[in-house]
């Protein structure tokens, strides 16, 4: 049976094994998928050991940059992202590194009926999560995409790097005031029960769509703030399922149906 897994530390909380088990059952693929607690001080050796038999793996924090460096070949979107969340062993034994995060976000937004083309998008944060989704968002040709970060210089850096891909600009949080069509929260503020300092004027009730890359059983602080102002909101559980489907297709050549898997995970979250 073909062996797959997910590298992380910690890894006990990961929903990836359940997601891929549901995908495998649905598509009739014979495979195993396990959580892999990798050591913080020697990820490459641990990963190479797994790939003596393993066919592919997902990579989560804190190993995405190390996976990027150890891949023998990179997809264009992984190269742009500077991080790898999916590894595939090729026929010749080399490792292909991919990044499916941005494709997962875009797929979930489209599933929710969000139009990206010609829209004004605000992306909060300037870390790895934001870097990973910039290219796929810009591929849909928004009218404008603003990267906002507490430290505006980090947002500026990303704008310079990705400038040729579309209409990008950078901002600090305090300078934001103009209403937008879509806000994507790529900060980890929700994990700490916090909210970036945002002006209520960014949201137009009934028009602005607000998406948090984080998810939890209860609405995140960001989603609560947005909903109170009349925005439509969605958390990142669908992104998790969609990026997993993208990885599954890379490994197995078959695209699973994500809707029933997302519904099952949502039911379990309560």
Swiss-Prot record:
Q: Which residues bind NADP(+)?
A: 76, 125-129, 149-154, 213, 236
Q: What does this protein do?
A: Involved in the biosynthesis of the chorismate, which leads to the biosynthesis of aromatic amino acids. Catalyzes the reversible NADPH linked reduction of 3-dehydroshikimate (DHSA) to yield shikimate (SA).
Q: Which organism is it from?
A: Stutzerimonas stutzeri (strain A1501) (Pseudomonas stutzeri)
The enzyme's main class, written as a single word, is oxidoreductase
Give any Gene Ontology cellular component. cytosol
Q: What is the lineage of its organism?
A: Bacteria, Pseudomonadati, Pseudomonadota, Gammaproteobacteria, Pseudomonadales
Q: Which GO terms describe its biological process?
A: amino acid biosynthetic process; aromatic amino acid family biosynthetic process; chorismate biosynthetic process; shikimate metabolic process
Q: Which Gene3D superfamilies match?
A: Leucine Dehydrogenase, chain A, domain 1, NAD(P)-binding Rossmann-like Domain
Sequence similarity: Belongs to the shikimate dehydrogenase family.
Subunit arrangement? Homodimer.
The entry marks the following residues as binding shikimate, namely 14-16, 60, 85, 101, 215
The protein's name: Shikimate dehydrogenase (NADP(+))
The active site consists of 64 (proton acceptor)
Q: Which keywords fit this entry according to its UniProt record?
A: Amino-acid biosynthesis, Aromatic amino acid biosynthesis, NADP, Oxidoreductase
Record's catalysed reaction(s): shikimate + NADP(+) = 3-dehydroshikimate + NADPH + H(+)
Instruction: Write out the GO MF terms.
Output: NADP binding; shikimate 3-dehydrogenase (NADP+) activity
